[in-house]
Amino acid sequence: MKTRLFLTIAIGALASFSLNGRGEELTATPANTSGEPATNAPMFQKLADAKWNKILPDLGDNSPEICILRVDPKTQATSLLIRTPKAIHVRKHWHTANETHTIIVGTASFACDGKRIELGPGSFNFMPAKMVHEAWLPANSLTFITVDGAWDVNWVEGPPTSADLSRAF
């Protein structure tokens, strides 16, 4: 019975997300809302079995996709993946919590605080909470992200649109 509960919680950690308002804030929500006690059991997830959701549904098949890997039930710290079917400029935004990016596939460009840098596979960066930043992600990129609190996106000038697709670095 405990194994079944652990598996249910582990699978449920591929949480859904909700778009609040007019897409100005994106928030990850934990899947375990059943009132069951949280667990510290190990969790394993194969990329091939990941559940992906569109971040910007208005962009249709061109939308970047998100896979919430795990949300800590106590702190709401979140581990997630983002992949991009098309190159996209992710407009200026900020997060309530500290955020890290590790590039798995592709070479992304990040800008913040008057600086811009390209990061390739294996590269890492840290964005302090509420630091306004933007990114240019290539087609078919994959980025691993951790957030030390609940994951959200607060757009400075609105979310990306079709005009931001395939925008050059």
Annotate the PLM regions.
Residues G23-T78, P160-F169:
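A short, N-terminal "cap"/entry segment at the start of jelly-roll beta-barrel domains
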Residues A41-K46, E134-F169:
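Double-stranded beta-helix
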Residues G60-N62, P73-T75, W94-T96, E118, ...:
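Extracellular/periplasmic catalytic domains that process cell-envelope and extracellular macromolecules
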Residues M1-L7:
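Bacterial N-terminal signal peptides that target proteins for export
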Residues R70, T75-H95, P128-V132:
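Conserved short histidine dyad/triad with adjacent acidic residue
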Residues K74, C112-V132:
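Short acidic-glycine-tyrosine-enriched beta hairpin
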Residues T8-S16:
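Bacterial N-terminal signal peptides
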Residues P85-I88, H95-D113:
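Glycine- and acidic-residue-biased ligand/ion/polar-headgroup-sensing regions
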